[in-house]
UniProtKB/Swiss-Prot annotation:
This is Alanine--tRNA ligase. SUPFAM superfamilies: Class II aaRS and biotin synthetases, Putative anticodon-binding domain of alanyl-tRNA synthetase (AlaRS), ThrRS/AlaRS common domain, Translation proteins. It comes from Streptococcus thermophilus (strain ATCC BAA-491 / LMD-9). The keyword GTP-binding does not apply. GO terms for molecular function: alanine-tRNA ligase activity; aminoacyl-tRNA deacylase activity; ATP binding; catalytic activity, acting on a protein; transferase activity; tRNA binding; zinc ion binding.
Amino acid sequence: MKQLTSAQIRQMWLDFWKSKGHAVEPSANLVPVNDPTLLWINSGVATLKKYFDGSVIPENPRITNSQKAIRTNDIENVGKTARHHTMFEMLGNFSVGDYFRDEAIEWGYELLTSPEWFDLPKDKLYMTYYPDDKDSYNRWIACGVEPSHLIPIEDNFWEIGAGPSGPDTEIFFDRGEEFDPDNIGIRLLEEDIENDRYIEIWNIVLSQFNADPAVPRSEYKELPNKNIDTGAGLERLAAVMQGAKTNFETDLFMPIIREIEKMSGKAYDPDGETLSFKVIADHIRSLAFAIGDGALPGNEGRGYVLRRLLRRAVMHGRRLGISDAFLYKLVPTVGQIMESYYPEVLEKKDFIEKIVKREEETFARTIDAGSSMLDELLANLKKSGKDTLEGKDIFKLYDTYGFPVELTEELAEDEGFKIDHEGFKAAMKEQQDRARASVVKGGSMGMQNETLANITEPSEFLYEAETAESRLSVIVADDARHDSVNSGQALLVFEQTPFYAEMGGQVADHGTISDAAGTTVARVVDVQRAPNGQALHTVEVEGELVVGANYKLEIDHSRRHRVMKNHTATHLLHAALHNIVGNHAVQAGSLNEQEFLRFDFTHFEAVTPEELRAIEEQVNEEIWKATPVTTIETDIDTAKSMGAMALFGEKYGKRVRVVSIGDYSVELCGGTHVANTAEIGMFKIVKEEGIGSGTRRILAVTSREAYLAYREEEDALKSIAATLKAPQLKEVPNKVASLQEQLHALQKENATLKEKAAAAAAGDVFKDVKEANGVRYIASQVEVSDAGALRTFADQWKQADYSDVLVLAAHIREKVNVLVASKSENVHAGNLIKVLAPIVSGRGGGKPNMAMAGGSDANSIQDLLSAVAEQF
């Protein structure tokens, strides 16, 4: 067996399948594009669904890839098992209606066992198969596999409801008796017992049936196009070929673990306690790649996943004695390990480090908040006489604050309390069930649309034309092809067309189709790409359309030109964002309509008003320079050498179009653009907002719409000027400033009157002094307009020796506000208010001499005041 690095394994995999006529599909971004069923790209086939469901026909039906993926369903298992990861690489080979079982099995066995390739010992390989799948069994036998190494397993059948399905055959590597301490042997495989001896390294799915839940599997009908979908985990193959005890002892993780050793001063012992090392090494890989792909930590969706991963890693760092921010220092190591195939981590290292470090520092403050919450929970338990911290509260600490259960247990036991472990497990399971239920399972092969997929007639888009005479080659209506149509809605393909099919954020052209007599026979309401790339015109039929006849196609010129202005402005906006906000602000989505443009981009905070103004000014400067917009067609390598930006989520062929706006912007783009920036006229940002964790959106308008937006603002300003009786618009700021000064003076006068009223009221409050166990205290409900007045009471109380402790409560606008002040060394105001606040259904905290709380139960204010004496 060869000793190969992970990079060598990956490259050998791709080289082997290339030798079998496969095209290499680059690893896609971890953030799915146009797939709401997935939170993350979670498998090698996830990015290829468009090929298997027939919506896109691949140039080559044989595909191979090495795809980075993220799965976080069972995050708690990371580090506890030898092979569980949140981020992993899936090696795959796929056939879309091309080769099937025989080639998949024969070639797979060749790759694994041939001395030219992986050279794994044949006697160490075992295969499982579906019992009724005799063809796979016979094919393995034909390859030379011993019958004793072929294990029938009833679960070896892939199906998710109705649709494509089929048997699968899995390949396992036997690591020997060393990993079978109970000497169970082959029963580990036969009975599907969790073990570390037989390691699954590859799964081959044979999609050949159309599943129908209403009939038994034996009656499933065969698919017209059979497919192959396989997956082999790079981490597992590396562990096997490097002789590593676990995946974590491979060259994919050990450099990270060595850095953690240096930071912690502790040694990684494979035979000892290694959990924290493994969790940190795993999680920083996910963080580095996901942030590099545009996801950012947040409170929902992908952002929540990343925040949780980071917080778990930080807490495990604390277990190793690392108290300062440290995860960000591991990013370069992750980048260096993966650089040969994934250079983007090192390319974006500074940005990734910045995000991780900032999140670590924020979490350090959050830990303090978690400690405060735990203190409050324990204080309430003590007051109620209970001795057990409830599972739901432990889970809230764990889930919201990232507090490990062990830390909660340790601190609670120090205070004499027990832990409700079962309640915590129940809350955890409930959350996991919710998470799993929210994932829409998407298989590799969707329903096949044969009618559209079988359209092979060519169609050419005429970039420069707005009208064209062209032959009608295809009519589709009611999901079937027709020779003619004279009413209703239909899908049309022409040999040539001036109509732009929606793509790359640019909306489709609209327009008309006329016959030889000049009569309009159809109106084009949409244009999309057919599976084989043709422009598929959706039309409302108004006359007769016949396949083979010639028609005049004419786009809506005004609509096209307005869309082009917005599309070119989008390129200018993208470049301005790079210049002003940073290179990390890359496109995450766009829409170029005729009335507006919408641009989504990755950024970790709101764009400031100053930045928005600078962006707007820079874009307009480029417009007013009247720069020519040039478009060339070239190969992808030449385009990249020109510095052209390739946009995330876009699929590029061998030939690409490069759109250049002077030396200001160079992008790969298949859309239509103005010939000169001066045609755009004017650019105005109308809105900037967040649309999700780490993603911002800018709405903008150009040309006439920009002018109208400025007019609307001017009209509003004129209305304000009239109200303020300002004769000129430029005098409005001075008028507003004058009103603000008057308002400030009145507020100051009002505050003075409040202070005098408070002083008068305080005289009565401070007379009501009580004593309990040697502590003099004042506990009173007061009538005030805001919480600030309570602090005014406290300030006056401090000026004289009225009492040792002051407790004030007020009912202000449907809420209860409580203040505790203390001059006594024996009474901690912060601790006292934590005990009192729950009485009014509130919470709070503070320092030894001053604390405040808020609550909602005004009916219990007197109960709170009565409880003060019991605390001394």
